[in-house]
């Protein structure tokens, strides 16, 4: 299979599973796009293990342990400069998933082909993948997050890790301090995940999960059940509105604090980070405008809305909106 065919299949996987990220990732040059499709496929493996229905926590834990062991092996091979795979491993590996290589071992084999190539070809920090696994482990025994510090830790592990990996693949301009760029990338990833949390309150609650800071809920005299009841009732509840607006404001503030990141990435990644961020900012904006409705029904952008954002990003027309 030639490269263009493989990339087309990889793009289909990402389009189907990563409905928001796809619109930005497809704006990248082929090599970077293929690398991040492979990264997404790996992230999808651990996410699917943690969220698998009809599977007990012991089995989920064993699945994550298996992926961790294989990931550590790949990282060790990178450190020993022993990753000897062909230049088309990313496309071939992820393409195997698109062809329906099967669940379990076959699927993971395909993903790890891609991971080997990513770690070989880009200066990606292997520890980010291990931190992402720890983030999924936090979901194995759902619990209340006592305060924002705990919520932020979860966001860092499941989302900011991805942001930092993206930065390693995108690259930064020659005059940019990489450490500062990584700090801003962390903030952007946290803002993305806070948006996900606010979007998915009802869905997470059904899974026995709540990522909202418990102390802030208590300070407003409410529980998650109160939030869900508020969304279903006809009467207004100022406490719920106040809480939701404060959560949205925090996420918007963190987006704003990371605004300088967009000008730091390599020129060929500017449109991508712009599109991805604009899509998430628009989801957050819709939640903030009507949080009660957002609690009742998951906020989504249509394919047309996301395509329009991506087009504006490609043309450099998104502006500096935070």
Task: Show which residues each predicted segment covers.
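Catalytic cores of Mg2+-dependent Asp-rich isoprenoid enzymes
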Residues: 1-82, 89-193, 198, 202-322
